[in-house]
Amino acid sequence: MKVFAVISALFMTVAANAGKPDLPDSIYVGGQLQHVQGIALDQEKGCMYMSFTSRFLKVDMNGRILASIDRIQGHLGAMTFNHQDRKVYASLECKDDEIGQNIAKKLNVGIVSESRFYIAIIDVDKMTSLNMDPENNDV
């Protein structure tokens, strides 16, 4: 099911770039604990960015994970890549509902008392390693 979600999401990106032979028709990134929420293509660097609820990945076009941000305290969802400033802008929901409480429990962080909505800004060029922490790394 997770593979299907990734392939479906990629289909939209690939379809939008039809006629560009350097793009694969699918990218498999291995088993993730959550389902894909958002994707963005960085043609200049030849990679993609993917959000998986509380995890953000930078992957090459073969699906190899180049860098990751883990323990994002909330629900990281839809996103877009701005090629001019080289940043990803993504919706980040910190909700006090059952889903938000489950995310907080899995990450062993405090549960929010009211829902909050943000735009997460990720400097993808500062993503250099796996398991980066959004609070302790300058990303």
Regions found by a protein language model. Name each.
Residues 1-9:
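Sec-dependent signal peptide recognition
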Residues 8-17:
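Hydrophobic h-region of N-terminal signal peptides that target proteins for export
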Residues 23-29, 125-139:
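Surface-exposed loop and turn segments in beta-propeller and other repeat-based domains
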Residues 25-54:
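Beta-strand-rich domains and repeat architectures in extracellular enzymes and scaffolds
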Residues 27, 35, 62-107:
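Blade-loop segments of beta-propeller domains
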Residues 41, 59-60, 81, 120-124:
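Hydrophobic/aromatic beta-strand positions that recur at structurally equivalent sites within the blades
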Residues 43-72:
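Beta-propeller domains
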Residues 104-127:
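Beta-propeller blade signature
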